Regions:
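Conserved donor-binding/catalytic core segment of Leloir-type glycosyltransferases
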Residues: 8-11, 140, 182-186, 193-218, ...
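N-terminal subdomain of nucleotide-sugar transferases
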Residues: 1-47, 69, 229-232
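N-terminal strand-loop element at the rim of the active site
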Residues: 12-17, 32-65, 160-168, 247
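Short acidic alpha-helix that forms the nucleotide-activated donor recognition element
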Residues: 65-69, 134, 257, 281-294
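Donor nucleotide-sugar binding/catalytic pocket of nucleotide-sugar-dependent glycosyltransferases
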Residues: 131-198, 203
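Nucleotide-sugar-dependent
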Residues: 20-21, 218, 279-288, 294-318
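Acceptor-binding helix/loop patch of EC 2.4 sugar-transfer enzymes
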Residues: 12, 16, 96-127, 147-153, ...
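Nucleotide-activated donor-binding/catalytic signature segment of Leloir-type glycosyltransferases, i.e.
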Residues: 243-246, 252-288
Length: 318
């Protein structure tokens, strides 16, 4: 029988009715662990929602150390280890969630900024990863391909060594795969989110859904051009972007989001064949939108971020 432990799951992302990928992953990890342990989900962002089988709340710099000192296990993601260097000496078991390869992500996030800013952003990411790799007791990732990436990183940092190898030649006890997963309950539509609700989209129109945010590493422009070509054969085709404004106010609008709107306007598609939902859809209401779609689409550029990322929103299409 598993003994109950006090577990902290820590994120920097906003915990609210509307959540992005990192917050959703932290929320679902906390929910899964809450079935057998005393779990507190902490965020340094805003928190306006309750947990489900666990406590969800905001924390701050002054309170965080005391929270960690009272925990048996800390599961963390994002830029935390380098900021709170005392975590290196913590007696808690530190589990580092590496599902977001943010050092590769930074190459795209900062792509259109001056070179010194880009180099500084990458250096900050690598400093954080170095702190995480030096201290983590267990590392999580979201796919076998990601695991290959991180084994290389761990090996270069000396974490794949005679001790860790002899303890487990598969290295699964050092780094393991925790996929994002699918909801165990079937989606149910309470009310229509798109068809017959959005002005310009009728109840019988075929809908193409872009189910996540619009970031620099995505290629919505190709999809919009395809809609432009398709409309002559399918005049009632509609494309719907599920959320343009990130729920975390610290995440700025990216250049690709601006270019997407501009192209749609230039082709005369906006409000006729292409529609933008400005605000993020509430997490619990996403089925209302997904079940109104006939096609789910995502497009990416052929670069290293695409190769090693894990597109959390696409699982909802299934």
């Amino acid at each position: 029988m598993t003994s109950r432990r006090r577990i902290l799951v820590v994120t920097l992302d906003t915990l609210a009715e509307r959540m992005a990928g990192p917050a959703i992953r932290a929320f679902e990890i906390a929910r899964a662990l809450g079935a057998e342990h005393d779990v507190h989900l902490l965020t340094f962002g805003g928190c306006s929602r309750e947990g489900d089988g666990f406590v969800a709340r905001a924390t701050d710099v002054q309170s965080f150390r005391g929270e960690v000192e009272s925990a048996d296990v800390v599961v963390l993601q994002g830029y935390l280890m380098a900021t709170f260097d005392w975590l290196q000496e913590s007696e808690a078991t530190i589990v580092v969630d590496l599902y977001d390869p943010f050092h590769l992500e930074s190459l795209e996030v900062e792509r259109f900024k001056p070179a010194p800013e880009r180099h500084a952003a990458l250096a900050r990411a690598l400093t954080e990863l170095s702190a995480q790799v030096a201290r983590g007791d267990l590392f999580l990732c979201a796919s076998e391909k990601q695991r290959d990436l991180w084994i290389g990183h761990l090996a270069a940092a000396g974490r794949v060594n005679p001790d860790t190898y002899d303890a487990d030649t598969s290295l699964r006890s050092l780094i393991t795969v925790v996929p994002f997963g699918l909801d165990s309950t079937a989606p149910r539509q309470v009310e229509h989110g798109i068809k017959g609700v959005v002005d310009g989209i009728d109840a019988d129109d075929p809908v193409i859904l872009w189910g996540g945010g619009v970031y620099n590493w995505f290629d919505p422009l190709t999809v919009i051009r395809a809609v432009d070509e398709l409309r002559s054969d399918v005049p009632d085709v509609r494309m719907y972007f599920l959320g343009m404004k990130h729920p975390n106010p610290d995440v700025p609008e990216m250049a690709m989001a601006v270019r997407t709107r501009e192209l749609s306007d230039e082709l005369g598609l906006t409000g006729r064949h292409v529609f933008f939902n400005e605000d993020w859809v509430p997490y619990e209401r996403r089925a209302d939108y997904l079940l109104d779609a006939d096609i789910g689409v995502s497009a990416h550029f052929d670069h290293v971020e695409t190769a090693f990322s894990f597109r959390t929103r696409i699982l909802d299409y299934l």
